[in-house]
Amino acid sequence: MPTIQQLVRSERRKIHKKTKSPALQSCPQRRGVCTRVYTTTPKKPNSALRKVARVRLTSGFEVTAYIPGVGHNIQEHSVVLIRGGRIKDLPGVRYHVVRGTLDAAGVKDRRKSRSKYGTKKPKS
């Protein structure tokens, strides 16, 4: 426990929490342009071809973002919206593409959890 005199001399250190998505810079989402769209393989126990995109953000960062859902229309120079949220089995992928906004179309024929994939309500 410091004395009052020690606290007068130098105040207490603030604890700075390290952000998990620095490229967003405290914004909920960021817009960016895809520089490369490709597939990559996950870490050890899992096996798949995960769809990811390299995105140059308006904040100046270049990040790797996961493209969720079955099928996508994203290609190079597509303008996409990025949100936070990592993919546990893809190292270095800390962002998600928001489906159904800007150039990223919603998932076709999606019935459940539609709001997460930018799909409109089907006609009965």
Swiss-Prot record:
Claim: Plastid is one of the keywords in the record: yes
Stretches the record annotates as Disordered: 1-28, 104-124
Primary subcellular site in the record, as a coarse category: plastid
Role, per record: With S4 and S5 plays an important role in translational accuracy. Located at the interface of the 30S and 50S subunits.
Biased composition, class Basic residues, residue ranges: 11-20, 109-124
Annotated protein name in UniProt: Small ribosomal subunit protein uS12c
InterPro entries with a match to the protein in the record: NA-bd_OB-fold, Ribosomal_uS12, Ribosomal_uS12_bac
Designated gene of the protein: rps12
Family annotation (PROSITE patterns): RIBOSOMAL_S12
Quaternary structure (record): Part of the 30S ribosomal subunit.
Keywords from the named record: Chloroplast, Plastid, Ribonucleoprotein, Ribosomal protein, RNA-binding, rRNA-binding
Pfam families: Ribosom_S12_S23
